[in-house]
UniProtKB/Swiss-Prot annotation:
Residue stretches of biased makeup (Basic and acidic residues): 731-740, 1161-1172
Name the UniProt record assigns to this protein: Caskin-2
Residue ranges the record marks as coiled coil: none
Keyword Signal recorded: no
GO CC, alphabetical: cytoplasm
Modification type Phosphotyrosine: residues: Y253
Chief location category: cytoplasm
Disordered, as annotated region: 355-460, 676-1104, 1116-1181
Encoding gene, per UniProt annotation: CASKIN2
Length: 1202
């Protein structure tokens, strides 16, 4: 074997001459027929399995390789490691030897014992040309070696950038990135990104990210971020964070990247990585200051003092959701804990740590699904280089319980239109709540847009935070026009915005497509795809960031008269010539543009197309609103004089019934809640949709929840506006914005009241009423006999939305007077107890004609006028009366059941002691709160149960109490213009005292047939029921509006206290008071219908008949001390002096005559209805009740005279 060893030695030494001699001898022996027995073995292998060709390939000598191949050397001979000559040639990276071996048909995909092919070696050592040649000869880059690594893995692991780019540009790039040849369950499974991150190859990582590799792909060790953090690759960590890696992902050891850094590294690089990870994740670390546990709450997080808690999110009730990881036990605990027991350990940059406990801090939406709170920032001018985000201010007046909600938290709040509204702690407005499963609302609730609100309201809101955005970010105000954003600063703004989430590479996509900042805020995922954002991860990230933008409304809120003006408002005046040349030279034609027509015209940029179509859509909305406004104004002239009430019942589960038809809009353009949808969809004109003050991505929950009751805490009584002020300054629901004017007011009228919906009125003529000048009165109508009330059901919220009818077209010759000083807006928040399933399916309550009239639990308020008194009101069986009624919105029989249910007291009816009336106060807006007025010279209550005037009630008025007090719904009158009525619904938010059983027939008779004295004047306080009395229950139906007097000047109708005879205390007031205190609202006392009747007296002014001991008085919370003093009415001439027996007897006779007249009127009404063939069930038992009433009345009058 000497010659073989000589050959190997010659090849190793590169002795080409010696190799040629040895090879020549081999050739010579082949030509002989009888050759030597000792032939030269060219494929001889040494102890390591190396052949001469192995050595030649390893040495890279082309001549030697060629000589050996000519001598018939085996090209794919393997050594002891399974390596072939091509492996060594590729390892050396010499191109020509590889080409020579490949031409000799060397196997390109032959694997060694460790599973490597020549491409593995070339890629590992970065031989670009060799790798390229191997790929050209069909080398498979997806083959894995025994370590489960592909050539791309090796190139990325060792930082071979060019080879990695070569492999990524191959046709098998997707397979390489997806790792199709690998088993994810393999413990050795890895990805090119992990290998590059482990070794800190930033450029390779950048190439992988550009190629679209999944950045959050996990292995046993976690994500690539785990690898970079573990090995201290700070720049790689920063690069991965810029690429959008999820920092909250845990590996199989339940560790995040931050956990790994904290546990295993202590270098300077680790400190930088910690800061980067904390900033990127938005993790809020807190340390427990004391132990906390709650065994009664399974969702509570039990903590010990010193525990480090990771805050995940915040519950709407103010608690924080935290996570405690116990590394020693390897367990995790998640639950809720109060923020007051912890201190901040780590926080995001810019968040004041001192404020976090008082204003709970949610986390970044991209990771924890909760909005990022703002940081305090110094005031600086508005810049366009940063886009605003949605956030919630820690300065929210609602405090730390209601200021921030969690989009993904457990027990998230219900729909804003039908859910709970949180009451602010300082009385300025409700807290901002975030609605679950909705786009993050804008903090634009605090933005006051010019021209849309009265100056006073704008001034009122000016002190509140402008917008809630993160540090260094500003809100674009309404004054920013699109053309201003296009003046060179828009590109910078878009670039900075995209840089915040490391996608600045798409800046050119937005700019080339013609998108500016306002239009980006309206982009959809489809629009992103159209401009070239094709990667799903990037598209999802940008779409989520767009949803968080807070851009003020920029579309024109009016219909321009000129096309150029409209284009300038959109910031696209350059298309004026193209539109005109294409025939779109007027606003009417532009309103019909479509996407296809824009392309035909020459508007090729997608952003410009988007903006033009948004403008066209706005024009269509404005036109539709104008048409609805015209229809509304025409229908308003035919409205019946009587007020119409629409009660919207909210279902207990927060979901309203599905409504057919188009979605209705509020004044701000946001969708109404399901309850309002259901209530308004039944009929009548739709509300006028005005231009929204905010973009759809900024719809405020507060704007859609205004007017909703069902507050979480006991509401405080709203103070009364005692001082005269403009009507538009009346008490609105807290935190609401003023709606813009719908249309010009009717002649002689002030601004329209603040209402949500204008129910359609009747086109017919109004019903005949009493002669002009007749005083206006309350009329409580009797219904069917009171039945034992049902136990209280779960409370449900109702909204009383009413609109007074206009005075135009009245057939009674009413004189229109100035309204601006007397007409005020009214909005009341009430609750109704749950009704039957029928009520749940049809929450709309509106007047309907004839017997099927559903009646709402409210009473109409009308101003009283001077003049001759009206005849006694007739017994009414329906709200409609003789006048035709407008078409009903809903024919549901549900409200009938509610008509016999218990009455509720309105939230805006705090109580006070009863006091005498006086002349009308100066005209001013009526407050939502009803209150009492002190009588002249401290006279006792005019109709109280005793002459002392309930001292305990006056003592209760010295302090302001938030808790409800037993009270009843006293009637109240408000000065309103001619033909305008308001409806006050009553609520069950205040418990009532049980009725005095002995006097129940008396009160029934008095209130039903008008013998009770009149209520005080418009400026006078309301009478209050005594503790032993109870207000009438809801068995009485709605009074007929048209039957009440409609004209005259308000005048005091109740006599002075001097006319009252000495009144003994009512039976058992103390007993009833104690009983009332024990009564828990389990059952409601029986109801008593009532009607207040005015009869003529001896003087020129009407002198109502009064019966003692029938006054409805109640004690309520003290009204707000800010109310100014009210005028003290002077005593009337005919009511001065003492009351003698003769006067008492005269009053008794007058009372008897009035009762007889009322009885005759009732009998006549019954007879008329029976003749018409439409007897009402509510009148069947009237005559039976009257005899009992008279007996009780006679006993009471005798006791009173004694």
């Amino acid at each position: 074997m000497g010659r073989e060893q000589d050959l190997i030695l010659a090849v190793k030494n590169g002795d080409v001459t010696g190799v040629q001699k040895l090879v020549a001898k081999v050739k010579a022996t082949k030509t002989k027929l009888l050759g030597s027995t000792k032939r030269l073995n060219v494929n001889y292998q040494d102890a390591d399995g190396f052949s001469a060709l192995h050595h030649a390939a390893l040495g890279g000598s082309l001549e030697l390789i060629a000589l050996l191949l000519e001598a018939q050397a085996t090209v794919d001979i393997k050594d002891s490691n399974g390596m072939r000559p091509l492996h060594y040639a590729a390892w050396q990276g010499r191109l020509e030897p590889v080409r020579l071996l490949l031409r000799a048909s060397a196997a390109v995909n032959a694997a060694s014992l460790d599973g490597q092919i020549p491409l593995h070696l070339a890629a590992q050592y970065g031989h670009y040309e060799v790798s390229e040649m191997l790929l050209q000869h069909q080398s498979n880059p997806c083959l894995v070696n025994k370590a489960k690594k592909t050539p791309l893995d090796l190139a990325c692991e060792f930082g071979r950038l060019k080879v990695a780019q070569l492999l990524l540009n191959s046709h098998l790039c997707v397979a390489l990135l997806e790792g199709e040849a690998k088993d994810p369950c393999d413990p050795n499974y890895t990805t090119p990104l992990h290998l590059a991150a482990k070794n800190g190859h930033r450029e390779v990582i950048r190439q992988l990210l550009r190629a679209g590799i999944e950045i959050n792909r996990q292995t046993k060790t976690g994500t690539a971020l785990h690898e970079a953090a573990l090995y201290g690759k700070t720049e790689v960590v920063r690069l991965l964070l810029e690429g959008g890696v999820d920092v909250n992902i845990r590996n199989t050891y339940n560790q995040t990247a931050l956990d790994i850094v904290n546990q295993f590294t202590t270098s300077q690089a680790s400190r930088e990585i910690k800061q980067l990870l904390r900033e990127a994740s938005g993790i809020l670390k807190v340390r427990a200051l004391k132990d906390f546990w709650n065994l009664h709450d399974p969702t509570a997080l039990n903590v010990r003092a010193g525990d480090v808690i990771t805050v995940l999110e915040q519950h709407p009730d103010g608690r924080w959701k935290g996570h405690i990881h116990e590394s020693q036990r390897g367990t995790d605990r998640i639950g809720y804990f109060p923020p007051g027991i912890v201190e901040v350990v780590s926080k995001r940059v810019g968040i004041p740590a001192a404020r976090l406990p008082s204003a709970p801090t949610p986390l970044r939406p991209g990771f924890s699904r909760t909005p990022q709170p703002p940081a305090e920032e110094p005031p600086h001018p508005l810049t366009y280089s940063q886009l605003p985000r949605v956030g919630l201010s820690p300065d929210s007046p609602a405090g730390d319980r209601n200021s921030v909600g969690s989009e993904g938290s457990v027990g998230s709040i219900r729909s804003a239109g039908s859910g709970q509204s949180s009451e602010g702690t300082n009385g300025h407005g409700p807290g901002l709540l975030i609605e679950n499963a909705q786009p993050l609302p804008s903090a634009g609730e605090d933005q006051v847009l010019p021209g849309l609100h009265p100056p006073s309201l704008a001034d009122n809101l000016s002190h509140r935070p402008l917008a809630n955005c993160r540090s260094g970010e500003q809100i674009f105000t309404q004054d920013v026009r699109p053309e201003q954003l296009l003046e060179g600063k828009d590109a910078q703004a878009i670039h900075n915005w995209l840089s915040e989430f490391q996608l600045e590479g798409y800046t050119a996509h937005f700019l080339q497509a013609g998108y500016d900042v306002p239009t980006i805020s309206r982009m959809t995922p489809e629009d992103l795809t159209a401009i070239g954002v094709t990667k799903p991860g990037h598209r999802k990230k940008i779409a989520s960031e767009i949803a968080q933008l807070s851009i003020a409304e920029w579309l024109p809120s009016y219909i321009p008269t000129d096309l150029l003006e409209w284009l300038c408002a959109l910031g696209l005046p350059q298309y004026h010539k193209q539109l005109v040349s294409s025939g779109y030279d007027s606003m009417g034609l532009v309103a019909d543009l479509t996407w296809e027509e824009l392309q035909e015209i020459g508007v090729n940029k997608l952003g410009h197309q988007k903006k033009l179509m948004l403008g066209v859509k706005r024009l269509a909305e404005l036109r539709r609103g104008l048409l609805q406004g015209e229809a509304l104004s025409e229908g308003g002239r035919r409205l019946a004089k009587g007020p119409e009430l629409m009660a919207i019942e909210g279902l207990e589960n927060g979901e309203g019934p599905a409504t057919a038809g188009p979605r209705l809009l509020t004044f701000q353009g946001s969708e109404l809640s399901p309850e309002l949808q259901a209530a308004m969809a039944g009929g009548g004109p739709e509300p006028l949709p005005l231009p929204p003050a905010r973009s759809p991505s900024q719809e405020s929950i507060g704007a859609r929840s205004r007017g909703s009751g069902h507050s979480q805490e006991q509401p405080a009584p709203q103070p009364s506006g005692g001082d005269p002020s403009p009507p538009q300054e009346r008490n609105l629901p807290e935190g609401t914005e003023r709606p813009p004017k719908l249309c010009s007011s009717l002649p002689g009228q002030g601004p329209p009241p603040y209402v949500f919906m204008y129910p359609q009125g009747s086109p017919s003529s109004p019903a005949p009423g009493p002669p002009p000048g007749a005083p206006w009165a309350f009329s409580y109508l009797a219904g069917p006999p009171a039945t034992p009330p049902d136990p209280p059901r779960p409370k449900r919220r109702s909204h009383s939305l009413s609109r007074p009818g206009p005075t135009e077209g009245d057939a009674e010759g009413e004189a229109e007077g100035p309204v601006g000083s007397t007409l005020g807006s009214y909005a009341t928040l009430t609750r109704r107890p749950g009704r039957s399933a029928l009520v749940r399916t049809s929450p709309s309550v509106t007047p309907t004609p004839a017997r099927g009239t559903p009646r709402s639990q409210s009473f109409a308020l009308r101003a009283r006028r001077k003049g001759p008194p009206p005849p006694p009101p007739k017994r009414l069986s329906s709200v409609s009366g003789p006048s035709p009624e407008p078409p009903p919105l809903d024919e549901s029989p549900g409200p009938k059941e509610g008509a016999t249910g218990p009455r509720r007291r309105t939230l805006s009816e705090p109580a006070g002691p009863s006091e005498p009336p006086g002349p009308p106060a100066p005209a001013g807006p009526a407050s939502d709160t009803e209150e009492e007025e002190p009588g002249p010279e401290g006279t006792p209550p005019s109709r109280g149960s005793s002459g002392e005037g309930l001292p305990f009630a006056e003592e209760g008025n010295l302090t302001i109490k938030q808790r409800p007090k037993p009270a009843g719904p006293p009637p109240r009158e408000t000065p309103v213009p001619p033909g305008l009525d308001f409806n006050l619904t009553e609520s069950d938010t205040v418990k009532r005292r049980p009725k005095c059983r002995e006097r129940e027939p008396l009160q029934t008779a008095l209130l039903a047939f008008g013998v009770a004295s009149a209520t005080p004047g418009p400026a006078a306080p309301l009478p209050s029921p005594t503790p032993g009395e109870s207000p009438p229950a809801s068995s009485l139906p709605q009074p007929e509006p048209s039957s009440l007097p409609a004209q005259g000047v308000p005048t005091p109708l109740a006599p002075s206290p001097a006319m009252q005879p000495p009144v003994p205390p009512c039976p058992g007031p103390g007993l009833e008071s104690s009983a009332a205190s024990r009564w828990n609202g389990e059952t409601e006392p029986p109801a008593a219908p009532a009607a207040l009747l005015k009869v003529p007296g001896a003087g020129t002014a009407p002198k109502p008949v009064s019966v003692a001991c029938t006054q409805l008085a109640f004690s309520g919370p003290k009204l707000a001390p800010r109310l100014g003093p009210r005028p003290v009415p002077p005593p009337r001439p005919e009511s001065t002096g003492t009351v003698g027996p003769g006067q008492a007897q005269q009053r008794l006779e007058q009372t008897s005559s009035s009762l007889a007249a009322a009885l005759r009127a009732a009998e006549k009404s019954i007879g008329t209805k029976e003749q018409e063939g439409t007897p009402s069930a509510s009148t069947k038992h009237i005559l039976d009740d009257i005899s009992t009433m008279f007996d009780a009345l006679a006993d009471q009058l005798d006791a009173m005279l004694d």
